[in-house]
Regions:
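Terminal low-complexity "docking" segments
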Residues: 1-126, 130-178
Length: 178
């Protein structure tokens, strides 16, 4: 069983909230028009207003998977393999708690779209690029990691060698597993 197939099976376990995908549209041939919106029950650009329109073909997008059927599995596996997406999982809700809403997860990731350089100049932060996220996470301190992970249990992506890479927060430290 491949690492992706094993991960997909885990996502289907009872009590698991629907996973999300962070998609870096900058690498999608044909731009935003070619994004696989039909596998998501909610899907939005992480930029808003004029910026979302102006940069729609290179912007980050967040989608919550509508199902874990074969079509969604194939699309997610393809996005991961082409280094265009990061699979985001949430922890199972405790007791009668509900998992965070799409709006809450969307707001959480929007917080990281802009960072400030050494001279206070705002800069776009492409944290959603699967080719760099692990290296970015490795330089964050404990508080920054706690803030970044927020409601997220795991980030799953394909490494440079194609192997699945899982990132999580464990005791305030980044844990990376291949």
């Amino acid at each position: 069983m491949s690492a992706f197939t094993e991960l997909w099976s885990q996502l289907k376990q009872p009590g698991q909230p629907a996973p999300y995908m962070l998609i870096d549209c900058a690498g999608v041939e044909g731009g935003a028009e070619r994004l696989p919106r039909d596998i998501f029950d909610e899907f939005e650009c992480l930029f808003t207003g004029d910026l979302a329109e102006e940069l729609e073909d290179v912007a980050p997008y967040l989608g919550r998977l509508a199902s874990l059927g074969p079509e969604a599995q194939a699309v997610v596996e393809d996005l991961l393999a082409r280094h265009l997406g990061i699979l985001v999982t949430l922890p199972p809700p405790a007791g009668s708690d509900e998992p965070p809403s799409f709006s809450q997860v969307h707001r959480h990731f929007r917080k990281f779209n802009v960072v400030y350089g050494p001279e206070g100049k705002p800069l776009f932060f492409r944290y959603y690029d699967p080719r760099v996220i692990v290296d970015v996470l490795k330089v964050l301190d404990e508080q920054q990691l706690i803030s970044f992970f927020g409601p997220v249990a795991w980030l799953c992506l394909a490494g440079a060698d194609g192997c699945m890479v899982h990132c999580t927060l464990a005791a305030g430290q980044l844990a990376v597993r291949e």
